[in-house]
Amino acid sequence: MTMGWHTVMEFTPSLIGCVIASGNHSFELVRRSRECVINIPTTVLTDKVVGIGNISGAVVDKFEKFDLTSAPAQHVKAPLIADCFANLECKLADGRLIEKYNFFVFEVVKAYVARRPKYPETLHYTGDGVFMVSGKIISRRAQFKPEML
């Protein structure tokens, strides 16, 4: 499944919230297993990201169709996509909003990040088939007050 939207909800523990459409094949798989892997691609995988989002895993093996490399996860049953820049193994932390809003709250239990590139060109979906690419880095580290988070 290609995820169109997610949000960081907390840093300790690391919580991520996302909406998964109830008609999506992944919705029931994730709801039943109470776990998933969030794979973070770079622009190199743009066409594969779109293709993955346009077909259901109920009718095709997406790893095979899109020539993706799977890797075993340590804490969840779902595989990692080794082709991605980062992978987040997640377990359901709060399911109270699933029935009403299809909103899942996951705790990241293990994270993997490639050492290079230091600042990858990651994709950010803006809607209607349009993506924004990360790029320019702006630092305000000297002014940042982490205690205010």
For every predicted segment, state its role.
Residues M1-L149:
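Basic, polyanion-binding surface patches
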